[in-house]
């Protein structure tokens, strides 16, 4: 009998853990200010070294799970890949920019100062340009998605990130009037995508050669689960120890940032999901296609926001709000996908 799987305890209550990290981080910033002051000294090229290490602990295990050899199967059933790539790279970054600009600069203009609106827009753009990696496997499972095909979708997107993320971010931030140092942006992509991706590929090949694929999937990869959890929690606490003053002065801004992020998530899900219905794809391909577009690679977005704008920036705060809202919104979309399975043909497309 197949072991029942689903969203883990930590992932299910991620919003609660993030809320606790907000409280702990703010408390540290207010009552133990020496801690963030000391951490701020450990920087290189605007990159916080402690945070970089923690983010590697999050991203490296994700890259271990992706079998990039699966990309060779991309031509067998191309429609789902086309939907995923077009949604993630041609539609999503631009709708995120448009929705965020509308809310931060127009609808919430009287509530958000112009300087902060610019930073929040930058954070939203970073989220919109980074499609999800690790959590997609959870959402795919919860919607009874085709696991092998989801793997191909994720692998293709991770490879596209290498070449498309930096130009798209630079272009959209330039349109929004946000100046960014290209060298820092490229360094961020190298640090938080190229290095962990390369390390993941090398590790995967070496371990599978020595121990086999079953050992790798059932034993080796699972050893890193706690590191990922710990890395995320500690990163959030550090971030909020720097962000405490901003949050205490503007508590409503958490909600204001969340509104366009939630709307964008729902919109992109229905764009990809509706496209899959139009092309008559099977539900086990359509649902993961919608989930990949809807969710974000928030670890990468947080890392790049810190590198480009700093730990205390509004851009970093916006990316962290993305972490806060992601799980409850995605669970809602999982429910919608499962309740609309009858929209799709029974036979594989």
Regions picked out by a protein language model, each given a short descriptive name:
Residues 1-64, 69-294, 298-349:
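Alpha-helical transmembrane segments of multi-pass small-molecule/ion transporters
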């Amino acid at each position: 009998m197949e072991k029942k799987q689903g969203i883990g305890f930590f992932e299910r209550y991620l919003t609660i853990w993030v809320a606790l990290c907000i409280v702990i981080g703010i408390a540290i910033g207010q009552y133990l200010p020496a801690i963030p002051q000391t951490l701020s000294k450990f920087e290189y090229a605007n990159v916080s070294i402690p945070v970089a290490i923690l983010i590697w602990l999050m991203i490296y295990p994700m890259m271990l799970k992706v079998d990039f050899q699966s990309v060779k199967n991309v031509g067998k059933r191309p429609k789902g890949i086309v939907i995923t790539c077009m949604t993630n790279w041609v539609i999503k970054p631009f709708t995120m920019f448009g929705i965020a600009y509308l809310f931060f600069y127009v609808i919430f203009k009287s509530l958000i100062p112009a300087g902060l609106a610019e930073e929040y827009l930058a954070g939203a753009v970073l989220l919109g340009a980074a499609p999800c990696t690790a959590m997609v496997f959870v959402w795919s499972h919860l919607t009874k998605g085709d696991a092998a095909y989801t793997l191909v979708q994720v692998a293709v997107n991770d490879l596209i990130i290498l070449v498309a993320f930096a130009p798209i971010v630079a272009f959209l931030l330039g349109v929004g009037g946000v100046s960014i140092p290209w060298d820092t942006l490229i360094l961020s992509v190298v640090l938080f995508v190229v290095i962990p991706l390369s390390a993941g590929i090398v590790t995967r090949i070496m371990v599978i050669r020595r121990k086999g694929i079953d050992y790798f999937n059932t034993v080796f990869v699972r050893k890193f689960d706690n590191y990922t959890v710990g890395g995320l929690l500690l990163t959030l606490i550090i971030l909020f120890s720097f962000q405490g003053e901003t949050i205490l002065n503007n508590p409503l801004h958490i909600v204001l940032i969340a509104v366009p992020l939630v709307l964008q998530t729902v919109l992109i899900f229905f764009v990809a999901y509706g496209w899959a219905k139009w092309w008559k794809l099977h539900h086990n391909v359509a649902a993961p296609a919608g989930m990949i577009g809807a969710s974000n690679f928030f670890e990468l977005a947080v890392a790049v926001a810190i590198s480009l704008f700093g730990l205390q920036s509004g851009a970093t705060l916006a990316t962290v709000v993305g972490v806060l809202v992601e799980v409850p919104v995605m669970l809602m979309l999982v429910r919608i996908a499962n309740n609309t399975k009858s929209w799709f043909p029974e036979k594989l497309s």
